[in-house]
Amino acid sequence: MKQVFKLLLACAVGVLPMSVGARDSEAVEVRKMIDKVNQHWQAENSPEVRSFWDNAVYHTGNMEAYFLTGNETYRTYSETWANYNQWKGAKSDNRAEWKYSYGESDEYVLFGDYQICFQTYTDLYNLAPDDKKIKRAREVMEYQMSTPQHDYWWWSDALYMAMPVMTKLYKVTHNAKYLDKLYEYLIYSDSIMFDKDENLYYRDAKYIYPKHKTVNGKKDFWARGDAWVLAGLAKVLKDLPVEYKHHQFFVDKFQNMAKAVAAIQQPEGYWTRSMMDPEFAPGPETSGTALFTYGFLWGINNGYLEKDIYMPVVQEDLYDVTAEIPLYNAF
């Protein structure tokens, strides 16, 4: 999974604000990094794999690489994957058996880990509109929105897996219900796993302090879990209309969370698995560090985070993450 997060990082670095000369030079290096990592990944991994999160997350990064580089082989790779999966997540057509607890079989249609694929399908639709590409995405999400339940996003990963699906489909359909349900579902998530004092998310309700503690008695915030959220908020803000009534809610959440994450960065530039207790699981949590970097860079580049404050954070963790790419560093 490390390649996924390096790709997200590389795409974010590719739009760093710099002087013209530095920007041109850096762009060449970033694209070299993207191509070496991504082309190696695609050469070693068939696109004909399931649409569950473990593969679908990669395609969110692959599409960002395509948008940045224009490399048609990247787009083709994701289209092959989408066609292999019939532009679906979980494939059950019997709504009576659709579930959203954890599961990997075809009845888990409403589970966010089987909805992240809709992000890539929507990206591909926007490049070449064809209703078949988002037919299933709309069927699933619009059925979900028609139900009275609002507890679909019960674990932090869902805020990357499913939350951006709502804004992407809103941009296609202009159906305001996507935004209102997005807000409603996030409010529920906040009610069960958000720590208002720390501005961070627990992995899920089982990890709430003080019911759950680290071995040293501290709050246990999982780096990749919070990184999913920060990156997910960045993706939502990218598509969320500024005139939307709850837009400032999302801005505040993104900014407050970025501040909280930056404050507990390790001196070496990374975040540990349990962010407030480095001794609980020492050493870098690379996937979380990469996704945090993506979120920080997106926020800087789009005016949501102050460059003077957050670029030093990025410069610290950038070295740590890029040093973890053995393929690139071998050249």
Name each model-derived stretch.
Residues 1-25:
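Bacterial Sec-dependent N-terminal signal peptides
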Residues 23-56, 64-112, 118-120, 124-127, ...:
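CBM-like carbohydrate-recognition segments
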Residues 42, 46, 70, 86-91, ...:
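Helix-capping and short linker residues that terminate individual alpha-solenoid repeat units
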Residues 54, 61, 81, 113-116, ...:
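Amphipathic, well-ordered alpha-helical segments in soluble domains
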Residues 64, 123, 143-146, 168, ...:
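Positions within ordered alpha-helical repeat solenoids
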Residues 130-166:
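Asp-box/WD-like beta-propeller blade repeats and closely related beta-sheet repeat scaffolds
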Residues 157, 167-275, 281-293, 305-331:
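Extended ligand-binding clefts on enzyme/binding-domain cores
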